[in-house]
Regions:
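Short, basic/aromatic recognition patches
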Residues: 1-13
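Hydrophobic alpha-helical segments, chiefly the membrane-spanning helices
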Residues: 126-131
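A short, polar/charged loop-to-alpha-helix boundary motif
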Residues: 39-49
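Short beta-strand scaffold segments in enzyme catalytic cores
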Residues: 19-24
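Conserved small/polar residues in nucleotide/adenosyl-binding loops
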Residues: 114-119, 123
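Iron-sulfur (Fe-S) cluster-binding segments and ferredoxin-like electron-carrier domains
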Residues: 84-99
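Short beta->alpha transition motifs characteristic of CBS
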Residues: 31-37
């Protein structure tokens, strides 16, 4: 986690939101990143997103199920979605984010229950009753 804190300090020095992330595979750090939304003028340039991309390129596969993500703050819904889609094996964060956290702080993307109507039901619900 210390490496993630160091990345957060780098973000702060660069006038970014001070969040850092590290991806570990087989006990080796394979990716480090910090927020770069202002620097890159990119709202998706969060530490977790960048670190996940670097890790996938390093491994040569988008599936990161053998990896661990260490991040200084609970990932937002976008970053939480990326951890789910990349199949990160474990996520460790220093503190919850009750306003924007996607893994329990504000919302729990990893354990949402949902129902989805069949396509026929969706079609029916859009048609007026007189049709």
């Amino acid at each position: 986690m210390q490496h993630a804190y160091n990345e957060a300090i780098s973000a702060w020095i660069a006038d970014e939101v001070p969040i850092g992330a590290v991806v570990v595979h087989d006990e080796q750090i394979i990716a480090t990143a910090h927020n770069q939304t202002r620097t890159q003028n990119d709202p998706t340039a969060h530490a977790e997103m960048i670190a996940i991309t670097i890790a996938a390129n390093h491994i040569g596969d988008w599936r990161l199920n053998e990896c661990k993500l260490f991040v200084t703050k609970e990932p937002c819904p976008m970053c939480s979605g990326a951890t789910i889609m990349s199949r990160i094996g474990e996520v460790h964060f220093s503190f919850e984010d009750p306003k924007m956290g996607g893994l329990g702080g504000a919302i729990s993307l990893h354990c949402l229950l949902y129902t989805s109507p069949s396509p026929r039901d969706r079609t029916r619900s859009r048609m007026p009753s007189s049709a």
